[in-house]
């Protein structure tokens, strides 16, 4: 018996960089690694999510969203399709952890479905993660984030940036259940949003940073390395094992290298028990699984 827990995350950041070779859109440069970027306005996570939920309710009341069943039909039509989205493949200058945090926070999103519960008349919002891959409102997240939830009255799908701007998901551009990824179009109302550039390949042992919203802790960043590339026993697809911490709410979150390039996307965890697959032996290890950028690149186009 496999104990796989899938999670959802979301992030966004604040900082301008230029690139060392190409200057990518929204990626400005800083050569000063000693520069300190202070968090001027720490977030109150529950208030942030509550405010986002109110904005979602308003969009639904004004019928400014795409119904979830329409998105599901689109998803089925886009299984294993290339999104045809032209992504940035430039290489920004290396950054330290402080700079990466601000950079990631501007480019990460809280992604979640809106739903009605059976205890009150209010809209609720599931918390997951995603990230921007094109400035015109194209984002990436996990397939399981946009799956139909059994027994839930789901109305729509929404993405929220770190400033609290809420964008309805209006179209599914590509989806892969086996690779647990989805590429979506959101309506930004004409607003340009900063995107993450894509690396060509994931490098074993390299330092990485991850951002997400585990357990409702919005825009939480963790650090680790890529520990392994492997073929999953569960689905036969290529995955990477990472040592960055994450939990429920971080699914779909971006994983970047020290240049701020996407090298993977959060997907799942697998608990390993002392007594084989029996919980009686106690948890001995938790493997963190991510989708490598070499897989993500199959669903986009590089410029």
Q: Residue locations for each model-derived region?
A:
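Catalytic-histidine neighborhood of serine endopeptidases
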Residues: 127, 134-178, 204, 279
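Short, surface-exposed secondary-structure boundary micro-motifs
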Residues: 144, 213-214, 268
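C-terminal motif of bacterial Sec signal peptides marking the signal peptidase cleavage site
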Residues: 16-18
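N-terminal activation segment of mature serine protease catalytic domains
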Residues: 25-132, 299-303
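Bacterial signal peptide processing site
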Residues: 20-22
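Sec-dependent signal peptide recognition
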Residues: 2-10
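Serine endopeptidase catalytic core focused on the charge-relay Asp
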Residues: 154-156, 161-162, 170-231, 256-259, ...
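Active-site region of chymotrypsin-like
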Residues: 106-123, 187-194, 218-303
């Amino acid at each position: 018996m496999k104990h796989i827990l899938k999670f959802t995350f979301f992030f966004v950041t604040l900082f301008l960089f230029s690139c060392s070779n190409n200057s990518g859109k929204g990626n400005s440069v800083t050569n000063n690694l000693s520069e300190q970027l202070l968090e001027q306005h720490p977030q109150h996570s529950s208030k942030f999510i509550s405010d986002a939920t109110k904005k979602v309710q308003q969009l639904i009341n004004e019928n400014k969203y795409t119904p979830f069943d329409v998105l599901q039909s689109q998803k089925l039509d886009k299984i294993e399709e290339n999104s045809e989205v032209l992504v940035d493949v430039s290489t920004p200058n290396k950054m330290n952890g402080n700079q990466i945090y601000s950079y990631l926070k501007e480019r990460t999103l809280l992604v979640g479905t809106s739903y009605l519960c059976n205890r009150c008349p209010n809209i609720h919002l599931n918390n997951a993660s995603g990230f921007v891959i094109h400035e015109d409102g194209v984002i990436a997240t996990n397939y399981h984030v946009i799956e139909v939830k059994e027994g839930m009255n789901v109305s729509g799908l929404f993405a929220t940036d770190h400033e609290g701007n809420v964008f309805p998901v209006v179209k599914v551009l590509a989806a892969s259940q086996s690779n647990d990824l989805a590429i979506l179009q959101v309506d930004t109302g004409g607003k340009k949003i900063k995107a993450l550039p894509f690396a060509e390949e994931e490098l074993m042992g390299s330092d990485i940073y991850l951002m997400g919203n585990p357990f409702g802790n919005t825009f939480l960043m963790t650090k680790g390395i890529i520990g392994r590339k492997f073929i999953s026993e569960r689905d036969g697809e290529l995955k990477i094992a990472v040592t960055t911490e994450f939990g429920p709410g971080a699914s779909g979150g971006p994983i970047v290298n020290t240049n701020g390039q996407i090298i993977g996307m959060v997907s799942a965890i697998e608990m390993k028990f002392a007594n084989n697959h029996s919980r009686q032996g106690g948890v001995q290890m938790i493997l963190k699984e991510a989708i490598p950028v070499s897989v993500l690149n199959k669903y986009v186009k590089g410029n």
